[in-house]
């Protein structure tokens, strides 16, 4: 039985492990790339967004997936620029510039979709409704906090992920090169 609960400090190593295990090979195949992946997709969320982030825990207490969410992308970016982006620049100037543009690219949609999420599930737990349970917990939290929409970005070749997001109510809002931006409007209380 999978239990969904809020992310806690002791979950951060597991979340980082899952982030790297599920990342595409080309963004983790060197120590610098692996560090950039953690800084880009994990560490700012786990450092600043614990109240709107959740983990899935199996029956033995192992974290097998997570959903990380910033309820306000502009506030998140301010934190990201203040710490994680600076660390990325230390790994290489080109990597820093690319990361800056990747981080700000969803901002154009943040008026309609102020929240931004990142989700990863260990491969052996995919297809077992773990992602749907995490998504449900996040939607409930965002609705209770009166957040009007949430967005994400995924790769256009990640067909399985795009279908998962569509099944969970997301719609494609924009495509750019290899990226697909998806958004979900949430009911207001």
Regions found by a protein language model. Give the residues of each.
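Active-site rim helix/loop that mediates acceptor-substrate recognition in acyltransferases
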Residues: 31-53, 59
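Conserved GNAT acetyl-CoA-binding A-motif
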Residues: 112-115, 142-154
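Conserved acetyl-CoA-binding loop-helix of GNAT-fold acetyltransferases
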Residues: 118, 127-141, 163, 167
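Helix-loop element at the rim of GNAT/NAT acetyltransferase active sites that forms part
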Residues: 17-32, 44-45
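A short beta-loop-alpha structural element at the N-terminal edge
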Residues: 2-17
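Conserved acyl-donor/pantetheine-binding loop and adjacent beta-alpha core of acyl/acetyltransferases
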Residues: 73-118
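C-terminal "cap" of GNAT-fold acetyltransferases
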Residues: 148-162, 167-189
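Conserved beta-strand in the GNAT
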Residues: 55, 62-71
């Amino acid at each position: 039985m999978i239990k969904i609960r809020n992310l806690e400090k002791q979950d951060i190593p597991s979340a980082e492990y899952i982030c790297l295990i599920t990342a595409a090979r080309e963004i983790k195949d060197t120590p610098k790339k692996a560090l950039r992946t953690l800084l880009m997709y994990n560490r700012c969320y786990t450092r600043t967004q614990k109240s709107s982030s959740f983990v899935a825990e199996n029956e033995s207490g192992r974290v097998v997936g997570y959903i990380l969410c910033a309820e306000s992308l502009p506030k998140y970016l301010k934190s990201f620029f203040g710490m994680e982006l600076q660390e990325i620049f230390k790994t290489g100037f080109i990597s820093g510039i690319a990361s800056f543009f990747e981080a700000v690219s969803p901002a154009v949609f943040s008026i309609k979709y102020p929240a931004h999420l990142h989700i990863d599930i260990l491969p052996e737990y995919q297809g077992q409704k773990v992602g749907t349970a995490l998504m449900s917990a996040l939607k409930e939290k965002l609705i209770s906090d009166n957040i009007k929409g949430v967005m994400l970005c995924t790769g256009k070749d990640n067909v399985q992920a795009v279908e998962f997001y569509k099944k969970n109510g997301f719609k494609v809002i924009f495509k750019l090169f290899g990226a697909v931006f998806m958004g979900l409007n949430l009911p207001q209380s």
